[in-house]
Structures are given as C-alpha cells and as structure tokens.
Regions:
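Glycine-rich beta-strand-to-loop/alpha-helix junction loops that act as flexible
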Residues: 8-10, 65-73, 156, 221-223
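Proline/glycine-rich low-complexity loops and linkers
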Residues: 34-41, 48-51, 63, 76-172
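Glycine/small-residue-rich interface belts in oligomeric ring/scaffold proteins
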Residues: 47-65, 69
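Short, conserved active-site loops that position catalytic residues or coordinate cofactors/metal ions
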Residues: 29, 66, 74-78
C-alpha cells in the first residue's frame, strides 16, 4: 500500500511547531508494511489543501491528512478535503450529539473556566463532514475526523492524532518486511557493499549516517521475509556490525 502524508499548518511552515506527526506516522505505517511515498506540509489554505488532497488521492492508495480540525477560523481542513474530493459536507447527527456531550462534560468538569471564558464552539460546523464519510471519534480530543475515498483526516494535536490513527491502523497492514543492523563503518566506505546487496537481492537498502558517537544504521526493506533475512546475512559478512544502541 502506497501512502502520502499531508500535514496542514502555518505553524509548521513557520518553524513554530515540529512536524512530529509525520515522523510518527511514517514509522507506524512502515512497521505495518505500508510504504510512505510522499510527505508534504501545506499552509492553512483551503484551495491549496484541496488541490493536494485531490492530487494525492489520485496517485496513492491512501492519504493521511493531519491538522486544521480545531474551532478557529483558520481550521479549514475538513472543508478543503470535501472540496478536493468533490463532496458536499453534510451534518452528521451522531457526531453533533457527541460534540454536545463533550462540551457539556467539559463545562461540568471545569465550572470556573466555563464561567470565566466564553467558549465559542460551533458544534454544527464541526459536525459537518464530507458526504459518504466514515466519522472517526475518540475521547482524546474534541474534533471529529473521518475517512472518505481513501483519505484519512486526523487532528493535528499529537496525542489526539495517535488515538484516532489507532482506530484505523489495521487498514494499513501490508506485505513490506524490514530489518535493521548497525555499523561503525562510515557510509563513504560502504559504497560497493551497498551496491552489491541491491544487485543480488530484491530489496531496498537505506543508509542513515549518525553522529560520531552513534553507529550508522542500515535498513533493508523488501516484500519477502526470507529475501530480507538473506540480504541482512550477506551484509553482516561484509561490514562490521555492533549491537543495537539502547
């Protein structure tokens, strides 16, 4: 399964927030056997989000869009995804009732905050999802996400994103296998070995240099477990290896 990750947020592009969501999702998807082909960050711009949602949905098996589901005026992701896929947004009654319940529970649990501040929560707007979407709701956050036409729309707050991803994680299981070994050998001294393993085995090999105190990482990925194991064994015979760092 080929997947694209689309991160939405002016704050990410400005460097105010680290894009930890994309890194976490890429690792989770790879471990499950999916292949992440693209990672892109775009601003909170409805037209731009719609364009990239449409392009990625046409090109890849699945798209995960994160961010822009809050209640502020710049949170336009859900509307943009609907635009990109050619859907109208409709009111989901069950989502609306769930949001009302969450709002009431928050006010009850935080009476001083509720009395001191005016919370302008547009529940009707937040409950409007693309027609034919499958709503995604967790207790970790307020906003609802959804799945529609292979596009997964998740919140940008990391804990909320992770909780919602776990609702759909099994849908990304694939047949990719990977193994990793560590070596103190400099990357520049392994050119022939890396070329050789690619020529002999139907695998992909990633070499990830580290700092002087951390060994380099070699990651072998393929679709056949035995082939990956054989490639790792071939590498172990030709490069110095060290235990996995703690």
């Amino acid at each position: 399964m080929d997947v694209a990750l689309l991160t939405v947020g002016d704050e990410v592009l400005a460097g105010d927030t680290m894009n930890t969501n994309a890194s976490w999702l890429a690792a989770e998807l790879t471990d499950r056997g999916a292949t992440v082909r693209r990672i892109l960050t775009v601003p909170d711009d409805r037209v731009v989000i719609a364009e990239w949602t449409r392009e990625f949905a046409d090109e890849y098996d699945a798209v995960i869009v994160t961010g822009g589901l809050g209640g502020t005026p710049d949170d336009v992701t859900m509307a943009a995804v609907a635009d990109g896929l050619g859907y109208e947004r409709v009111l989901f009654e069950d989502v609306r009732e769930g949001l009302r319940a969450k709002s009431a529970a928050f006010r009850e649990a935080n009476p001083e905050l509720a009395e001191r501040y005016e919370f302008d929560l547009d529940i009707e707007e937040a409950a409007r999802l693309p027609e034919d979407a499958r709503p995604l709701v967790t207790d970790a956050g307020w906003a609802a996400g959804c799945v529609v036409d292979g596009v997964y729309v998740l919140p940008g707050v990391p804990d909320e994103m992770k909780a919602m991803f776990h609702l759909v994680a099994d849908e990304f299981d694939g047949d990719v296998v990977s193994e990793t070994l560590y070596t103190p050998t400099p990357e520049g001294a392994m050119g022939d070995v890396l070329s050789g393993v690619r020529e002999r085995f139907d695998v992909q090999v990633g070499s990830y240099p580290a700092d002087p105190e951390t060994p380099n990482r070699l990651k072998v990925t393929g679709t056949d477990e035995r082939t990956v194991a054989d490639a790792i064994a071939w590498l172990r015979e030709r490069v110095e290896t060290v235990p996995t760092p703690e």
